[in-house]
Amino acid sequence: MCLDIWRHKKKVLPLLLLMAIGSIIYYLYTLKLEGERDESATSTTSRLERDIRDLQAVFESEVIPDLGALGRPARGNWTEEQLEAIAKSQRETGYNAWLSKRISPERSLYDMRHRSCKKLKYPMEKLPSVSVVITYHNEEASVLLRTLSSLRSRTPIQLLREVILVDDGSTQADEKLNDFIKIKFLNMVQHRRITTQVGLMHARVVGAELALADVLVFLDSHVEVTKGWLEPLIAPILEDNRTCTTPIIDTIDFDNFAYRRGKPSRGFFNWEFNYIQLPLLKEEAVAMPAPHKNPIMNGGLFAIGREWFSELGGYDKGLKIWGAEQFELSLKLWLCGGQILEVPCSRVGHLFRDGNFQIRYTNKDKNSEKKLISRNYRRVAEIWLDEYKDKLFANMPHLTVIPVGNLAEQRDLKNRLHCKPFKWFLDNLATDFLNLYPILDPAEYASGVLQSISSPKLCLDRKDPSHGQPKLAPCSSDHVFPSPEQYWSLTNHRELRSGFYCLEVRNHGVNVHIYQCHGQSGNQFWSFDSKTHQVISGQQQNFRHCLEAQPELNAVTSSVCDPKNHKQQWKFGYLNSQRLQHFWDNVKTQ
């Protein structure tokens, strides 16, 4: 038996030896492979770091540390040459692109949320996932990078499924920028380029069709999101999947990139399809910062369920390039079973361009572009305003001769979704709007030209309200029914109105500007003293400023009222003397 055991061991020992040698060889081979992998990973990491450094040298080399930090105004002692570069960049983009390159894309922002917003907790495991859709056309690289950087650093990673970046036919496409975005933001950004510009609405639809998350968040390409912006924005959609939400839109100044607090408001449009903002209703103001109803959204920044957006048909496919899309989608939401809420606990800064900058959305001439926008207006009016479109057409008669295209698909959608009539919208969301912008306008206190008595050949003129200041110009031949630019009315709301623009004072009553009528009195309150012929701003009786002609400059200013100052004397084309006697009835004076 011992001999058998010995023979068995003699057979097994060589086998064990071979197995040991094999294990050693395998171990050494594995070590070699791991070393090669480590070298490869190190090489890849080094190459990635090198690429980032090279591209940072292109896009971030001019950054000045702490410039514009915490959203403070970015200022410096610029040379004459630099000031010329600043002016050039503002002419080309409508904002200080030169300065933007010198502000870090990762700059900090002050937390402007209401204190109660900071205490709110959200069920993160239940909140829906989000696809952020950003479209752009020839956007300044530093501005776009700041938008993306703020998203990456201030958005919970577990909620952000993707950022879909749609280049809408930029003529200044930059492959290095695309590479930098791909490397810097890794898998966060999905980049899609459309070779020929299709416009805001269609580019957004392209992005929405690529999206995979439960909720779509549409943002402009020149924004900065703030701390805690996303959770409150999407929480109402968790409660009701037919809710669309909008954040408070803070302002980023075009000239120094200062981040300024925006106010809660309710969006609307007037009877010339200008977007306007109305104050919160009393009960909404008391409930702040709770979400409140928003009749018409601004359109640039909003969140909506992906399936609900699809069910609504997205944007009307007949709308071209830009214009009226926020009216169309807002009306469709409210009238077809949804709602829009503004969420004060969510704040996003928006870079607003210089008011004098004329944005071009196409390569077409200016008149062709205006026709496209007018066509959009008419399509929205024909589908959604019902009989109230006549009020719009009375103020915008040129719309009636604009070809509107085929409306069958939109009418079918309206019927299929059992959408309510526009009257429901007015009755339920617009009671204060109708007081400010009635279907039938009440009698005016005075109207026609506003003629300078000291320079009787000159009248107040608003030829180009986008420039922000009125001027003096030769009077129209008809003083009662002059040209639209010289037709002013002292309205039932004590405004000095021309069309949908009002005269207002700024800088403690010194400067006179033209701005969209806001219906809140204040700096747009005016009265007329028929005895002294003075046009007086404000409701204060003890410290009054009057409109004053500056004929040598073809301008107007405001200064302390002086009955002996002939430059402060004016004459309306028509004066309703009997109605003017009751001007101060029911007006609170200070």
Swiss-Prot record:
Lumenal membrane side: 32-590
Entry GO MF terms: carbohydrate binding; metal ion binding; polypeptide N-acetylgalactosaminyltransferase activity
Pathway: Protein modification; protein glycosylation
Chain sites annotated for binding Mn(2+): 220, 222, 350
CDD domains: beta-trefoil_Ricin_Pgant8-like, pp-GalNAc-T
PROSITE patterns: RICIN_B_LECTIN (PS50231)
Keywords from the named record: Disulfide bond, Glycoprotein, Glycosyltransferase, Golgi apparatus, Lectin, Manganese, Membrane, Metal-binding, Signal-anchor, Transferase, Transmembrane, Transmembrane helix
Transmembrane segment boundaries: 12-31
Family to which the UniProt record says this protein belongs: Belongs to the glycosyltransferase 2 family. GalNAc-T subfamily.
Protein name: Polypeptide N-acetylgalactosaminyltransferase 8
Source species: Drosophila melanogaster
